[in-house]
């Protein structure tokens, strides 16, 4: 068996990744394929946590700009992340991976409350843990959730699984054909250059807690496993190069 580079990871998925080609909603076949990819990594003995965005179902900022109360808009988005978490958990269970959903907002009928010690025990027992409802407070993104939960569970790396984007560039490669991809960056580089991998709160949390980020294209089958076993794909962000 290949020895994985990372023993404990947090995979950050965008909500749009669950929507497939439709771009909105949840495409069950797409989620099932992703579950198979995650299972491949789980079979290597890697401990896995997940944070999934909610942008396929709801976006708080545009709703607030249209006149909705921002706090209510953000809470609505948090519920969207729980919907995504439950669907992913079911798909993982169906491929034979024991999975738990923990939410930052209590909803005992559908998920466990987020309790760090319990999450760690689940990971140590080989269960996947999906963190839903953000951090339970408005104004904080699911990127910040990923960085915070990674620090709390002492993850070795955050895998930023991007939809059709194969790394970090100095400009938008879809708009600028001269854009150059970075293979490696420091967290300080990301912040000083204003590169939008995560929001600034999440980037600072990752830097302060010495957590590696790997940004890669999740649409390429097998890429999650390639990252975990240490193949050079995408862009790696760390404190030390």
Curated annotation (Swiss-Prot):
Keyword Iron-sulfur: no
The species this protein was found in: Streptococcus sanguinis (strain SK36)
Residues that coordinate or bind ATP: 12-15, 55, 59, 163, 169, 172
Pathway connected to this protein: Pyrimidine metabolism; CTP biosynthesis via de novo pathway; UDP from UMP (UMPK route): step 1/1
GO cellular component: cytoplasm
Role noted for this protein: Catalyzes the reversible phosphorylation of UMP to UDP.
Single GO term (MF): ATP binding
Official protein name in the record: Uridylate kinase
Reactions that this protein is recorded to catalyse: UMP + ATP = UDP + ADP
């Amino acid at each position: 068996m290949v020895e994985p580079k990372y023993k404990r990871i947090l995979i950050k998925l965008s909500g749009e990744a669950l929507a497939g080609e439709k771009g909105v909603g949840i495409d069950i076949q797409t989620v099932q394929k992703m579950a198979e990819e995650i299972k491949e990594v789980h079979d290597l003995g890697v401990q896995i946590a997940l944070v999934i965005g909610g942008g396929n179902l709801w976006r708080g900022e545009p709703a607030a700009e249209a006149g909705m109360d921002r706090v209510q808009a953000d809470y609505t988005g948090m519920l969207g992340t729980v919907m995504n978490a439950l669907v992913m958990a079911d798909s993982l269970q169906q491929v034979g991976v024991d999975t738990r959903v923990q939410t930052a907002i209590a909803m005992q009928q559908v998920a466990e409350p987020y309790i760090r010690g319990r999450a760690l025990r689940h990971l140590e027992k080989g269960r996947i843990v999906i963190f839903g409802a953000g951090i339970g407070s408005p104004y904080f993104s699911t990127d910040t959730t990923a960085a915070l939960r990674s620090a709390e569970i002492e993850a070795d790396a955050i895998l930023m699984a991007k939809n059709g984007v194969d790394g970090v560039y100095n400009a938008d490669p879809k708009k600028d054909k001269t854009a150059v991809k970075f293979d490696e960056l420091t967290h300080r580089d990301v912040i000083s250059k204003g590169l939008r991998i995560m929001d600034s709160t999440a980037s600072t949390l990752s830097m302060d807690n010495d957590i590696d980020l790997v940004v890669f294209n999740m649409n390429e089958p097998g890429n999650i496993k390639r990252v975990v076993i240490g193949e050079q794909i995408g862009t790696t962000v760390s404190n030390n190069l």
